[in-house]
């Protein structure tokens, strides 16, 4: 599959994954006649990591034997993939993503999310093109931690919840285009798949059993959500989820992107007066059933510090924030109240 793309590949992965699948990957590349350069990912999707990997690719680091690669193959979770995409754009390489967990919708997107060395969210960057190839081995996904699989459901669930809200204002998507009905259809399909198959799929992944339900949710978590969010638009759920990345308690618990976004969904549902109680409660109950965060306790934020929550609300409400993609005014106070309401409802429904 790589031969049409180039002749030498950068293989970016983390050490545990390399030990797990390294021999298989190397043998496959050798059989295909693809030369390769292995680089270990150092743990965070930072601009410094992007530069470090790029320096190795062009041979300007201590690894002077490294020649220019023409394919970037990123193997692992979303952060590895995001760095691989950035390096590929910097050095005019083709992009191949190989997600080993279905924890978010990064694999298909022409975007990367950046953090600093303290794991705090710094922003996102859009690329001029999408990955040339996305390789997903369902058997690898089903043997990965179930928590990652569920986190992917949180990220994918938000795609329709946010698009449904922000399309009312004709909000531009991340690339500056107008969201299409096709994007909305993909987002809604992902949403419907999760509600119908998500609970069964989680149980199957817990048992490392590959079933049609798991296959459907893998597609929803990666392909459908990825195409949907990128061609559509985001709103409060991601604004809150991104800000939670800066909270020490969430960092200490290793909260995943989709888990933080899930609490953002809960808050957005409490923020939007047009959402019926029946619909809101149905989504809360689904998230509780699969194990997505809907309370501060789920986020490791108890006992709650009101000062921390106020800071989250203030930071989310800044001008230009995704939270302003709703057809109504969103303020720091309304965000604060929505998060408090989400926590209360989550506790009541558990």
For each predicted feature, which ranges?
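A short, small-residue-rich loop immediately preceding and capping a beta-strand
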Residues: 60-100
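ATP/NTP phosphate-donor binding region
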Residues: 1-70, 296
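Short glycine/serine/threonine-rich phosphate/pyrophosphate-binding segments
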Residues: 19-21, 79-86, 104-108, 233, ...
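A glycine/threonine-rich phosphate-anchoring loop and its flanking beta-alpha core
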Residues: 89-182
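C-terminal charged capping/lid subdomain of soluble metabolic enzymes
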Residues: 274-350
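Acidic, glycine-rich active-site loops and adjacent beta-strand->loop/helix elements
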Residues: 79, 100-104, 140, 266, ...
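Active-site segments that bind and position negatively charged phosphate/pyrophosphate groups
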Residues: 174-292
